[in-house]
């Protein structure tokens, strides 16, 4: 089975999680697929990165101290488009009940991926949300081929 990959540095992803192990794991896995990845330990740091770096997608934990991922995405959605206000976002969370998913979507997330993260599901979700990732993923041979 060939994992989906993106041309190096073509896809800019921001990982937001207060847990350093989760940040490292996701960063390493997605960089290994060719994405350019930055990581933030807090919602405040992430907002600055979004405004300055303009990632293609944010993957954020929702249960962080001080400010949650919900708070982050609500603030991001209030930004002008040229400051990152339309940046797509995936909630990456251990809260996986239907009401938790609904809360994430109502906050402004585009999708929800449960922890522990299934990397293939995360990659597929990225490909569904980010237009140029979708095109690149579609050009790859089907899994198992």
Question: Which residues does each predicted region cover?
Answer:
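The short loop immediately C-terminal to the conserved phospho-acceptor aspartate in CheY-like receiver
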Residues: 19, 58, 62-63, 95
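Charged docking surfaces used in two-component/phosphorelay signaling
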Residues: 24-28, 32
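The C-terminal output helix
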Residues: 127-145
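C-terminal output helix
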Residues: 117-126, 138
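The feature encodes the CheY-like receiver
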Residues: 23, 65-66, 97
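Hydrophobic/aromatic residues positioned on beta-strands within the core alpha/beta folds
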Residues: 90-92
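Short hydrophobic/Thr-rich beta-strand motif most characteristic of the beta2 strand and flanking loop
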Residues: 34-41, 49
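Acidic catalytic/metal-coordinating carboxylates
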Residues: 42-45, 68-74
């Amino acid at each position: 089975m060939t994992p989906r990959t993106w041309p190096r540095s073509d896809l800019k992803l921001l990982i937001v999680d207060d847990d350093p192990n989760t940040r490292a794991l996701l960063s390493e896995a997605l960089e290994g697929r060719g994405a350019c990845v930055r990581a933030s330990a807090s919602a405040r740091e992430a907002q600055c990165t979004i405004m300055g770096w303009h990632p293609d997608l944010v993957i954020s934990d929702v249960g962080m101290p001080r400010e949650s991922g919900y708070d982050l995405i609500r603030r991001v959605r209030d930004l002008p488009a040229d400051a990152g206000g339309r940046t797509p976002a995936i909630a990456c969370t251990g809260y996986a009940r239907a009401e938790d998913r609904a809360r994430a979507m109502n906050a402004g997330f585009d999708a929800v991926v449960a922890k522990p993260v299934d990397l293939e599901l995360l990659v597929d979700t990225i490909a569904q949300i980010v237009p140029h990732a979708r095109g690149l993923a579609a050009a790859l041979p089907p899994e198992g081929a």
